[in-house]
Amino acid sequence: MRLSDQSRQIVQATLPVVGEHIQEIATRFYRHMFDNHPELLDGTFNRGNQVEGTQRQALAGSVAAFATALVNNPDRLPERLLSRIAHKHASLGIRPDQYQVVHDNLMWAIGDVLGDAVTAEVAAAWDEVYWLMAEALINQERGLYSARGVRPETVWRPWQVERKIRETRDVVTFVVKRIDDRLVKTSLPGQYVTVKVPMPDGVHQPRQYSLTAADDGEHRQFSVKRVRGDGKPDGEVSNHLCDRVQVGDTLTMSLPFGDVVLDDWRPAVFASAGIGVTPMAGMLSHLRHAGSGLPITLLHADVDEASFALRHQVLDDVRALPNAAVHVWYESGADSALPVDGVHAGTMDVTAVDLPDGAAYYLCGPLPFMQAVRSALIERGIRPQDIQYEVFGPDLWQADFRTEPAPGSGEDA
């Protein structure tokens, strides 16, 4: 797959104007697509992200980021960008035919916003970009489905809530058990599932949640943080799960997906903030069950100790590992009753702790937190390719083609 030389020149020349109008293009694209295909809001698209605008920014930005990568590196595709999108799509059961729907509405929006600037040649060049990206994603998603022995419509399974655990004021953990005899693909440490929830108006809404405990073949565990609107609408799915779903209820969940998975053959450093601890909890649980003796370091930042979700599970797992250490940072001050190796006040400072040699690094938390920690790690001499990150919701880091490359984009190696 390679962008033609003619299209590459046109895309390079028009990227600035597309970037300048990317938000307007995205807004019109989604409005036009949902007017023509309202069924996509039932079980496929997160309408909360539509209200906030993050999904609009992520999709249009990803296309522009893909185009930028093709212009700058014509002989290679941005595999990390594609892999991240493909795993998310597979967790939603996206079908190949849906790419035509996106194409038609996206190209309409580009023409509608840019008007006469979209000549036949410009339209053809961006059409080529889109289909190069779409075909790469379709191929990756086909491989993901095939590896799990499913089709897009059969990624879903029913699970019954066996336990509901209140972790903090706003975080609830669900332990669910399988209730059918179909093959269940074992998750990899760090992966997530999509939970599809029927809302009061009859529309199903999907959300992704990291698995927070090692798989035993019969149970899965995930944790949900209640999204409080603070003047905006509350998160409809998180509040529904926290308030209405009870032990004995059935949840519809996808098979596990996600491309940020643990390299369990090398030392690991986990850096998380807030609810970003959830994928780290899943990885630590796996390491404990595997009897790992590797050097492991958990760095976690939170408002205070009471806000540290899954803290008892995480610390139990760390104590069971012979070469593990934990450092915490609390905005409220350096006060802790937990058995940790270091308690610090304020925001995370990775220069204040010892880090194991040859480690893989995993980041999860708010985007500014991850960007700051990554920069500090690189300044400390950590190779960019040794740093992975997980982001909740649309990946605005990968989608922002005008700032520094995101980890694994191909430009930071």
How would you name each of these model-derived features?
Residues 1-156:
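Globin-like tetrapyrrole-binding proteins
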Residues 150-250, 302-304, 329-333:
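Ferredoxin-reductase
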Residues 190, 276, 366:
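Short, conserved phosphate/pyrophosphate- and ester-handling motifs at nucleotide-, phospho-/glycolipid
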Residues 198-202, 255-260:
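Short, charged beta-turn/beta-strand-edge "cap" motif at the junction between a beta-strand
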Residues 208-218, 263-274:
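Short, compositionally biased
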Residues 261, 269-289:
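Phosphate-binding glycine-rich loops and their immediate beta-loop-alpha structural context
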Residues 267-269, 297, 360:
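Structural motif
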Residues 299-413:
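Reductase modules of NAD(P)H-dependent flavoproteins
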